[in-house]
Amino acid sequence: MRIRFLGHAAFLIVTEKGTRIITDPYQPGAFGGAIGHAPIPETADIVTISHQHMDHNDAKNLPGTVTVFDQPGEYEELGVRLKGVSTYHDDRRGQERGPNVAWVIGADGLQVCHLGDLGMALEAEHVTAVGPIDVLLIPVGGTFTIDAAGATEVVEALKPRLVIPMHYRTPKVKLNIDYVDSFLRDKPNVRRVGGSDIEVTPGTLPKVPYEIWVLEAAL
């Protein structure tokens, strides 16, 4: 499986069979230009959307025809297993920012979880629903999502082998959110990949307890 960090909360996941999945595609220039990433040129077979905010739901502007999943439930498409777990965008059961769907993507013997704009601590029922995770794509910037401390708690609850942070402030994301360094501080096993793409297989995943890989946005 290949994972490419496109920017913000958008990733391209390509399975060994060539199925292409894009998570939370952003609208370039959203929020008065706060989202400064270039338009996404990648084609996709499947798009997962965690919630209906413009920096996460711009499937309509992707090239080609895609199948969009934006509701909780269990699905299978082109040999990829998809599970949408209902969570919230805030810590008040959605009263401030509404619902959020955490997506578990199963392919190539791997379970990849994209948490979207998770804004709450996971309860036992959520951990059970998500299930065992190999790769966790997690927001860490706070303000609109869990912050560095909250993200650390979620990592400890889900126990993935590989953690890839997302949804943090960068020169191309000028939202009022924190930089990734707050999440990385005092953590062991941090690797700055120096690129946008990684290849992962069950045999090449980090062993124990987990590693954090920081990717550079491709766009």
List PLM regions with ranges.
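Active-site-proximal loop/helix segments of hydrolase catalytic cores
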Residues: 91-158, 175, 179
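Conserved acidic residues
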Residues: 45, 134, 161
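Metallo-beta-lactamase
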Residues: 57-109, 188-209
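Conserved hydrophobic/aromatic beta-strand scaffold that supports enzyme active sites
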Residues: 10-12, 74, 102-104, 135, ...
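Binuclear metal-ion centers of metallo-dependent hydrolases, dominated by the metallo-beta-lactamase
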Residues: 4, 96-97, 158, 162-219
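Pre-active-site segment of Zn-dependent metallo-hydrolases
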Residues: 12-48, 52-72, 86-100, 118-129
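Short secondary-structure boundary segments
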Residues: 25, 51, 140, 166-168
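Zn-dependent metallo-beta-lactamase
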Residues: 1-17, 27, 79, 83-85, ...
